[in-house]
């Protein structure tokens, strides 16, 4: 197959010829060709300073790069924690069956569809999530698969491109506003379509109302969600809306101008009044309305304190004016008052003093004191220093950083700029994972706006301080969240961690002192500088100050993005904010801190959420993924899931992580298959400790945590697996499906069974062929009489 | 800080220069911290993690950790050793290949059979002789009478016939006699003659005297090994000729001249024979004890009354010895062979003689007596059909080569053809492999983590490099050397995590990747992943 090498030439010409151009070049090639053709790669070697060994090494390291052509349509199945506990494996199996993908392959024989797993799409509250092409589907089930594929193909055939919500010219009509949350998970639930429908209805109605894009609203469990804000009437929230409701909603709130519209409004209100919902209780769009005084909404919001997410649901993410109008860049201006390039001023030290005094610690996981980190970088000799915003939020089950970048790009830019000024850096990089395209887009757009404004580049905020900011898109490697691996990645290398010391603060990017802070940490900085360190330090516990943003997901009623003061208990988060687990289920544990964290059992739920308390339990604060588990979650399976993840994401450099996690995973797989012996369990425990002690970087050192904590708190479940039982009835090899006497012979299970394991026997009790049964759970879900039992 | 400072390793202070690593400091103290991925020129690569030490409660690689003033390092502790051993065991769990070929592992005397066969194949008979003599006492006898367990393990046998290993020993020893080649290393007239083979003597530490009672297979084998260790050995036997039970073998199976020639080899090595002398009056254990530093009883199967005469504790009709040290309750009296446990196979009786020799040798050197350690070997297990086929492709096809003249045995050419059937499934780096070395030192268990292994793969390149990816431990030295030498193609890590492999870019061959630094990469490979083809194979 010959390819057009001119495209390669163009990309090289645009991106550059230095070694560090490698990853962007490969990203460009993949975008153009759909994969990385060898001829193109060889051409890259000829045209640039990049060595063939680097090209092969890097192209085979990162998940996003493909060395073989793929199907026309890419189906990405999210395998994040929340998706895993919600049954992503079953959805993937259904997709593969439906799309006729042979086992062991990822693409069907006609080259139409490629199904691949993706570490985490960061839409955890919509789990399980599947992305087909650019369309994201939330709350998927095996039964919905055919419908999803149909819907996707229909959108492709009709060329009905969903309008982008990114290039909006926002008209400021003044007066009333309708706020539509347009984070990527809201969009996955159709808020972009709703946005367009509302905008259309609003303009039909006449210009008295502005439909405004805002960032994350936090209440992911109720999206798409909008807020109608009217100066005279206060605000009303609507949840779970669809585009079909747009007109009725606009007309309910806003009086149209012309006669025709007026008549139409009256007519639609009559129609709306006739609509009954299933329960017959409320009518029309009114049934979607909720008040902020609603007990559920209050429980969700009352305990929260919004600092990193200040003005959530109110700000247009890309409106510089709005950001400035709400106190944006005040803090940066203050810091810049006397800053000049090349000279340290007392003000710079004052900034670091404030950060130190605030007690803020790194929100990326380890909780290193931020001020101290800044001071080390500031004290390093040399002119050239770098600041990096770590937006490689790789933990499955975490999406705080994505949401902050998507909703408050200017805030993070301000935080990074303050850090740059404080340590004396003139170049900053946003490292954002490519799985977050909207975050990348918005940060780029925000930087561009600031540059146009003359606020970035040679004159930061118009002063004499030069600061250049750029965005580096990650290429899909969890390990790049580790600072030294992240730096290697920016330098165009495989993302392999290095031994520390030397720390990046001493020898970082290009060997220069480099400050790396997490997105959330930087988002806190402007608030601290604006409101004072004391005010920040007044929130939280003795050693853990301020707030923490959590992605609350899993087996919980009100999932979403929350920001709570440090010291809030796990129980308050799960039961009050999240509303607890589903009725009839038992709250069993929370998985906190992702693959490096651990499982805290429900009996320890009164533990305060702060760095030390969580560490004492064997978990870590982590970046803030908080996945709630109930009695249907198998803890051995959870441990296996995380080991699978870390093993898959290990860079492969050091022995303990590369081989040790593999051997641990093998034992866990044996356990889940009911084939493990006591010796295996003992070896698992011994090896877990040794992998933790002997690995080179944080990824390997913390990889055994999910195993160690589940062994510590749920040993009985391991014991049960040794005896061949899975108490949560999750491990496929240890369970059996059968149909009891309640079966009425309705045949629904037989019709839905994807593998024909249930012969159709109308009006008599059905039987499941255990050999054919794949434990996909479909029959149990569809049975109207709860006659399907799992043993 | 540009002045030297000191750090403490296992309680011992050592002075270091600024910038020096903990590893460098430990070497100054003479500590042997194992390293696989460290090469000074490449700087610390920090991949193997076997050089771990404990500092401030944390395990860190010593090669990449710079010494800092006042640092307290733990190196030779149980905990640190356990971590190093685990690292080695993890590496072995993903290390595909045998250090030692199955035939060698099955040989009670550990003859390096594949090397012998490569010499024969290439017509290097003196070298083949040296290889045999290095391991086997009475090689000519074994070439005729050995029950050749080696051939049962030969992988070639999985395909057609095993290599005729015993026959090759016979060919070499017959050649020695017919050509007048003297396999003894002891040169006449004090000077080594050009035509004599390489020395198989190891220099004496301090001359000690040993009396061996019994000139059967066990006693002669012990005499052979003890003489090689530099001890003065006297073999006593009641018969007029040395050989013990070997003298009873029909001459069709073992002609007397063969046995005589083998005993002559021992004589040339310096073994004294005192024949026709029976233990009893006047030769007593007490008397021998006054004249010799150690006594080894290898008198063969004992009758009840004979045993009583020795006045040593018995278990049934056998002498009671410590199974680990071959020692009887009498000081400096050892016993081995059929007088301790009846041995039916000659080579096993000789292996007992070898074990006893090692016990005696250690005793004479003032060390605790113990049997020789089993050499460490990674074990690949049975080959699957595809792997076997790949091996067969790289060797001479066809079943075993029978000699034209059955009585005369294989000619040199026939022997070469038969030897060419060897699959060379041994590791070329065995004995020269850092991984194997430290596995032995640390008592690593190559099978601690049992799991499905990767497929064995051997890429024999036209230019003479053999690459066996399954043996690569991803130390990164070759990748780094290529980078430093700006190889036009070079080698790269390909893939991520457990699946990472070292390969040339764009699926090219290893040899094309190594245009400048092939020699260096082969020399520095810590395992047998990169080796050169040896003369006589492929």
Question: How should these model regions be labeled?
Answer:
Chain B
Residues 120, 124-127, 204, 209-211, ...:
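Feature captures the FAD/FMN-dependent oxidoreductase FAD-binding
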Residues 120, 162-166, 212-281, 392-404, ...:
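Beta1-alpha1 glycine-rich phosphate/pyrophosphate-binding loop at the start
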Residues 42-43, 242-243, 281-283, 498:
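Short secondary-structure capping/turn micro-motifs that flank functional sites
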Residues 180, 200-207, 243-254:
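Accessory recognition modules or surfaces
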Residues 29, 229, 269, 288-291, ...:
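Conserved dinucleotide-binding and phosphotransfer motif residues
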